[in-house]
């Protein structure tokens, strides 16, 4: 099998990627905070993780779970709601739709799972 080298942000050295479980690879990326139209920083993260997801799928025979969250509760969202006199759900739903359109335009694969923060508030509090 070909090896994949990634930069370890802790050691700042390139290291061979060695999964904990070769039969089940997990990849997590922080997705957007949906208070305003997506920007180039969101696109960069999308493309970088899309490439990594595709490479891991090839190297490990598609045994990759890619989770990318959507932060749909945040001070910036509340502020945008107040400034624009717009319901929080209207803002977040509109921006999520634009984000997904951008993902499609960039030809990024959909993540395996895309949870919203509001769907997991209880679990976050318990952590």
Protein language model regions, located:
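N-terminal Rossmann-like or analogous alpha/beta NTP/dinucleotide-binding catalytic cores
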Residues: 1-127
């Amino acid at each position: 099998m070909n090896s994949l080298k990634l930069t370890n942000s802790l050691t700042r050295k390139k290291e061979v990627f060695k999964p904990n479980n070769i039969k089940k690879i997990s990849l997590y990326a922080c997705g957007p905070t949906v208070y305003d139209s997506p920007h180039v920083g969101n696109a960069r993260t999308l493309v970088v993780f899309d490439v990594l997801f595709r490479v891991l799928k090839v190297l490990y025979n598609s045994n990759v779970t890619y989770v990318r969250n959507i932060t749909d509760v945040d001070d910036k969202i509340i502020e945008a709601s107040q400034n624009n006199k717009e319901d929080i759900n209207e803002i977040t739903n509109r921006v999520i739709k634009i984000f997904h359109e951008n993902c499609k335009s960039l030809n990024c694969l959909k993540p395996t799972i895309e949870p919203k923060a509001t769907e997991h508030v209880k679990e976050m509090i318990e952590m």
